[in-house]
């Protein structure tokens, strides 16, 4: 259970230092998004995990409406590795970890019995994404999945944006991807 005692910097009570870790010369971090209506979202660049969504109830009391994590260690070592993270390159199972594309068979990394699940054991959910926070309500994550990663063909450039809207008080999540090969 996440302690939702507000801190000076965020409503969720999450400690920024608990999300800062150097892993293979890459730095993980915590990003707090806020909008004009007081809504707040916390995310990390490790797997683009959504950690908290703090919204006010009808009495103005804030509550977290997401089952998230309270530290980077909890994200990394969770018994549910896909909980609150971004999965990929593929969502769901690929039977026997194989698929044929334009007559060429591709063998994927197996991580769910005989199958490949949610992009494999080191899919997007385990990657440290580059992050840019252009303003208080937006963070943009980027990741390059190399040709052959987890068995998938093609270099894949992925951009994921979390944005809080002021007027609708909505969290918008946008995905964009381009590849240099059929995948």
Language model features with spans:
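Surface-exposed acidic/polar loop and edge beta-strand patches at domain peripheries
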Residues: 2-183
């Amino acid at each position: 259970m996440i302690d939702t005692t507000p801190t000076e910097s965020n409503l969720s009570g999450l400690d920024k230092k608990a999300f800062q870790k150097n892993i293979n010369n890459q730095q993980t971090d915590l990003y707090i998004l806020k909008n004009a209506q007081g809504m707040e979202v916390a995310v990390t660049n490790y797997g683009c995990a959504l950690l908290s969504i703090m919204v006010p109830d009808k009495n103005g009391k804030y509550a977290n409406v997401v089952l998230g994590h309270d530290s980077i260690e909890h994200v990394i070592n969770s018994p549910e590795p896909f909980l609150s993270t971004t999965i990929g390159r593929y969502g769901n199972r690929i039977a026997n970890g194989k698929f044929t594309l334009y007559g060429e068979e591709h063998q994927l990394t197996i991580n769910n019995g005989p199958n490949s699940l949610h992009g494999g054991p080191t899919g997007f959910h385990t990657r440290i994404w580059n992050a840019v926070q252009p303003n208080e309500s937006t963070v943009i994550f980027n990741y390059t999945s190399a040709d052959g990663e987890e068995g998938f063909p093609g270099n894949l450039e992925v951009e994921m944006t979390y944005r809080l809207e002021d007027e609708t008080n909505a969290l918008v999540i946008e995905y964009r991807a381009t590849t240099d090969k059929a995948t």
